[in-house]
């Protein structure tokens, strides 16, 4: 028997709540805590829409403050060296938007659509290291919100590598075994 699910729910909000919360934070008008409140409200609302629509499996980890590929970069520790020393949302948004010391990561079209994603930057020296905190936190958040049939969404390792660029001429797909080992840990 087939099961219904949504591969990814639009995350910005019907009134573009996430966009406005992020812009206010970036302008220094609000704290990141305010962005987190908006995000929590949106996730809960979106899960409830799916529950009300009788969707069989409710997607979690389909929410992102900026980009799901960027989330995967963080999750698997593929952070370019120029962002060393940063952490938390400073790291996350510096990778996406740049900062005074480092240029932002490149963006390109997701499978020829109008959506742009952050392009992972890999080299022979990349050492993948799983940080599943976002995924686990969102899964627990969904369960606490009453989602009984949660399904984790995640960009797969082949897609991640195929859409990456290398900074040293190496082949991104040469990292498949190492990256897959981190996926297995999930």
Where are these regions (language model features)?
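Domain-level signal for soluble alpha/beta catalytic cores
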Residues: 1-186
């Amino acid at each position: 028997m087939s099961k219904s699910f949504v591969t990814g729910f639009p995350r910005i909000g019907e009134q573009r709540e996430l966009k406005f919360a992020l812009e206010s934070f970036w302008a220094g008008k609000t704290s990141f805590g305010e962005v987190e409140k908006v995000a929590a409200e949106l996730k809960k609302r979106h899960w409830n829409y799916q529950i009300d629509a009788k969707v069989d499996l409710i997607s979690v980890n389909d929410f992102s403050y900026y980009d799901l590929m960027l989330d995967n970069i963080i999750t698997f520790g593929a952070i370019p060296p120029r962002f060393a020393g940063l952490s938390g949302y400073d790291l996350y948004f510096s990778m996406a938007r740049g900062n005074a010391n480092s240029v932002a990561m490149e963006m390109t079209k997701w499978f020829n659509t109008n959506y742009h994603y952050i392009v992972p930057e890999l080299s022979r020296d990349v050492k993948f290291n799983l940080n599943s905190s976002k995924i686990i936190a969102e899964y627990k958040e969904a369960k606490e919100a009453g989602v009984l049939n949660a399904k984790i969404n995640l960009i797969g390792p082949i897609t991640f590598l195929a859409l990456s660029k290398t900074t040293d001429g190496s082949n991104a797909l040469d990292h498949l075994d190492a990256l897959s080992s981190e996926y297995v840990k999930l």
